[in-house]
């Protein structure tokens, strides 16, 4: 049996449509960025003999959407397209576990493990290409932010102690080269009418 319309007493074969809000993906983009930083291992921390392990995490602290610019390009099949930018700020939280030299003979060395933790700030931007204009009311979401590769170089060596092996060199500085990849998307909240079931 159909329900009765409360206002006019007329049978209502379908329930009224409802409006829902859904996030719609307008576009996606990604960026690779090389971060270079020089770290100094200063007293009371001992100098570095060898790096044992490195833990790292990319943290995005802020993402700002820049309004888009519209283009007409023949290489897009004559269709208009928009290019927007996202300004990104963040840091890389990095922990280095390293060996140092405390005692030595003319053939070998020994010493404890130490850890060195630092935060490497970065600022960059990525581009997002869309088929429609992006507005200030649209939102940007970070899909992923990861370290894709890294390299640590030891430099600023100390003199080798007398009677120690010639390879027992410790270093006061680390040059860090970190390649990060950030992926983001732009979403817009749109209203849709749906027909609920009985």
Give the predicted meaning of each segment.
Residues 1-198:
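Viral structural modules
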